[in-house]
Amino acid sequence: MVAKILDGKQISKDYRQGLQEQVEALKEKGYTPKLSVILVGNDGASQSYVNSKKKAAEKIGMISEIVHLDEDTSEEDVLKELDRLNNDDSVSGILVQVPLPKQVSEQKILEAINPEKDVDGFHPSNIGKLYIDEQTFVPCTPLGIMEILKHADIDLEGKNAVVIGRSHIVGQPVSKLLLQANATVTILHSRTKDMHSHLKDADVIVSAVGQPGLVTKDDVKEGAVIVDVGNTPDENGKLKGDVEFEEVKEVAGAITPVPGGVGPLTITMVLNNTLLAEKMRRGIE
């Protein structure tokens, strides 16, 4: 068996086409979704990522702006900028690019975003709504993972899904989404004993720990679906996933590559959530 390659770039391209059509329909009603991104400092990777989000938003007809603040900007001034965006009726969605400089509390900033504009889905209010099954903004990488799984030809109901990693950004929220899809979910982490036995029983494996080579062919049962969220640069700057792709694809039923798997969908879901934010505040289904 050679696995089906779950091409995140193509899935993302198709999904964005649908978003573009919805944006055009909104514009006909007189509304244009706008994404505002706060970037503090000059971290090269962050700048590149923010520019990718801006470009992607504009390509589907949204307005996007980058609010670029100096590295030494005080927490108070970041909060002031955030307050301005919270109260700007033209802004549909806000996200703050992390990491932030040491003088700025990430938690304090994330909690200061208007929950109705929190397109990253990191505000405690939105996290809480996710866990009681209310409509809310779901973190973008987990949302992207679920979209990828739709293309994996697997009915998640009753399946054993194993998530490696318990972060608030990926591991925990994707576990909740898998539960909502009626999968039986196990979360593995750094204190888990005998990780192999859990993995070997899994119909679906989502690995999100940033540990290259963690999942090998011996860990995977034949036909399992593998979603690799890891993206750790090696000494040459090449991105490596958590999964040994070349060997695992020989036994898996479907697998995401790194790069080109989950990454493109993460940005796509930022756009999805920005569109959702605009629709919700305008009372449009």
UniProtKB/Swiss-Prot annotation:
Function noted in UniProt: Catalyzes the oxidation of 5,10-methylenetetrahydrofolate to 5,10-methenyltetrahydrofolate and then the hydrolysis of 5,10-methenyltetrahydrofolate to 10-formyltetrahydrofolate.
SUPFAM superfamilies with a match to the protein in the record: Aminoacid dehydrogenase-like, N-terminal domain, NAD(P)-binding Rossmann-fold domains
PANTHER family cross-referenced by the UniProt entry: C-1-TETRAHYDROFOLATE SYNTHASE, CYTOPLASMIC, C-1-TETRAHYDROFOLATE SYNTHASE, CYTOPLASMIC-RELATED
Protein EC: 1.5.1.5, 3.5.4.9
Name used for this protein in its record: Bifunctional protein FolD
Signal peptide residues on this chain, from the entry's feature table: none
Listed pathway(s): One-carbon metabolism; tetrahydrofolate interconversion
Gene: folD
Entries under CDD domains matching the protein: NAD_bind_m-THF_DH_Cyclohyd
Keywords of this entry: Amino-acid biosynthesis, Histidine biosynthesis, Hydrolase, Methionine biosynthesis, Multifunctional enzyme, NADP, One-carbon metabolism, Oxidoreductase, Purine biosynthesis
Family per record: Belongs to the tetrahydrofolate dehydrogenase/cyclohydrolase family.
InterPro entries: Aminoacid_DH-like_N_sf, NAD(P)-bd_dom_sf, THF_DH/CycHdrlase, THF_DH/CycHdrlase_cat_dom, THF_DH/CycHdrlase_NAD-bd_dom
Biological processes per GO annotation: L-histidine biosynthetic process; methionine biosynthetic process; purine nucleotide biosynthetic process; tetrahydrofolate interconversion
Description of how the protein assembles with itself and partners: Homodimer.
Sites where the protein binds NADP(+): G165, R166, S167, S190
UniProt catalytic activity: (6R)-5,10-methylene-5,6,7,8-tetrahydrofolate + NADP(+) = (6R)-5,10-methenyltetrahydrofolate + NADPH; (6R)-5,10-methenyltetrahydrofolate + H2O = (6R)-10-formyltetrahydrofolate + H(+)
GO CC aspect terms: cytosol
Molecular function in Gene Ontology: methenyltetrahydrofolate cyclohydrolase activity; methylenetetrahydrofolate dehydrogenase (NADP+) activity
